[in-house]
């Protein structure tokens, strides 16, 4: 069985694993209520608002940069062309990110290879939560190693998120370096990275509306996950969630145990991020974790959303490729590669 996403106080049910849902609406005035079990630390409810959800509307959250990497925040609907499976689509809704609520999950690797970095991660994440979470935003916190643990459920309180960060402790899992002549039995469990992304997408984000993002802090090494990187990407796409990866390696750990000077998981992080519209930030001596969090914060506040109704009206659950083209030269669009169409009969 796959490792479960555990709350520190109560177990989170997995009943929604195989439930198919339609497209979520982003252009709404308030955040929809989650279908999850009662929150560990509930936030005060907003005024009741009637929300109309258009299940056929496809929403895309994206960023635009110069070829040198600078964010471009002031483009308009007329600056873009949109294609689905090579066919041009009509952009029906367009907005620059200003007041659209953000739902964010921070997933932190606590395996042995990250043990020396946890204090740095705790401090940097605390500062990030304090500066980025606004009244209508919500965030949750998950640690992953030999298991996946929900340290703090949805809240818009930086104080509660910081309290959850205090529960970060290395759990001893991680890559086995220079194994001996006698192999272990079964698949060793040490860093359930793919499971953590899969569970966060299915349990926490699938039923949410608005802008959604997962932030991973890890060296990218997965060991023992039940799900594959492909499974993790698929569920993030179905949840309309962007994955941002912070590639953070402790070179001393790998040199000490004969693994060179870095983890080998950067490729999987790039797959997850590029396919969902995010990207990989590399942390090193010249580019600290604090620096990376500041860059992410800037990107989250300089995004665009667009919505369209596909010309392909088939409700077949198929994967469809998306391409957004910007008309100005020397600019690059950062967006997810595609989406899964609503399946007939899906709720």
Language model features with spans:
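Bacterial N-terminal signal peptides that target proteins for export
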Residues: 2-26
